[in-house]
Amino acid sequence: MTSYTFTRELRLLTPAQFKSVFSNPIKASSAEITLLAIPNSEQHPRLGLTVAKRYVKRANQRNRIKRVIRDSFRLNQHDIPHLDIVVLVRNGVMEMENAEINKLIEKLWRKLSRRYNG
């Protein structure tokens, strides 16, 4: 049976892991969200999130955005190639509803997969 959990091994945890993604990434972006990714040696994708206070002032809003993105990753992890992915949130995402964020991030997962495979 397929597991849809978001365990510790599916996260980027250390600054070194984040830094490696920024070195020479594959990019997929929209006006509000950018995905940066590099291939990893694991058998699964890993996710790191950054939601800057500069763009989203309130903590509850930052947490909401991270929760929606994590949930989308959790449900789509088996369709995403073995990549280390960092999600950067920019200005404008705070005004979006959860469903809009989810739709946008799923579109970006597909775009990233195409760029990696194609």
Swiss-Prot record:
Keywords: Endonuclease, Hydrolase, Nuclease, RNA-binding, tRNA processing. GO terms for cellular component: ribonuclease P complex. It catalyses: Endonucleolytic cleavage of RNA, removing 5'-extranucleotides from tRNA precursor. The keyword Zinc-finger does not apply. One of its GO terms (biological process) is tRNA 5'-leader removal. It is an enzyme of class 3 (hydrolase). SUPFAM superfamilies: Ribosomal protein S5 domain 2-like. GO terms for molecular function: 3'-tRNA processing endoribonuclease activity; ribonuclease P activity; tRNA binding. Its EC number is 3.1.26.5. Transmembrane segments: none annotated. HAMAP family: RNase_P. RNaseP catalyzes the removal of the 5'-leader sequence from pre-tRNA to produce the mature 5'-terminus. It can also cleave other RNA substrates such as 4.5S RNA. The protein component plays an auxiliary but essential role in vivo by binding to the 5'-leader sequence and broadening the substrate specificity of the ribozyme. Belongs to the RnpA family. Consists of a catalytic RNA component (M1 or rnpB) and a protein subunit. This is Ribonuclease P protein component. It comes from Shewanella sp. (strain ANA-3).
